[in-house]
Amino acid sequence: MRKKRAIFIDKSLDTAIIISPSKYFNFPETPLGLTPEGMHVPIGREVCWAGFPAVSPKNLCLFAGRISCWLEDERAYLADGVAINGVSGGPAFHIIEENKVDILGVVSAYMPNRATGETLPGLCVLRDVKQLQKVVKGLSSFESAKAGENKPMSLSANKPEQD
């Protein structure tokens, strides 16, 4: 039996997408939105991210910080918050109006303070949601996602990676 998931990996962006038919999960009636294409979350905006940190792997934890800058070349945000081991790959959110949030990206890494070599304080790297939008737009069904996963996909180019 084939696995009921499709995986798209982009090693250069430290990003992956796992697509699974909704019948296997209790998804909300209205899913969270993605930050619109071409929009950047403003510097200073409060953001949060979720994950299962290695220090408490059975508990979903929420972390918060503020956008420090936008890195155009990396298509990523730096946020002044901690992303401890185990949180990478988790979603990052921002509030767009009362009781409504959008996904702005994915937790990718934590950059320690290079001046002192200390782990804290540091910056969290949040990869932009654009890579996810490209993959989702290119899919018409779960079957098309499954067919496209035979080789790891480059999310940035939306084509198979070369070995």
Regions found by a protein language model. Give the residues of each.
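Short intrinsically disordered coil segments
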Residues: 31-37, 80-83, 141-142
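Short glycine/serine/proline-enriched coil/turn segments at secondary-structure junctions
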Residues: 55-59, 86, 115
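Serine endopeptidase catalytic core focused on the charge-relay Asp
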Residues: 1-72, 104
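Short, solvent-exposed secondary-structure boundary/capping segments
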Residues: 17, 74-81
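Conserved short-loop catalytic and cofactor-binding motifs
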Residues: 55, 80, 120
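C-terminal cap/linker of serine protease catalytic domains
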Residues: 103-163
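Catalytic nucleophile loop of clan PA
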Residues: 81-107
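Short, well-ordered alpha-helical segments in soluble proteins
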Residues: 51-54, 71-74, 96, 110, ...
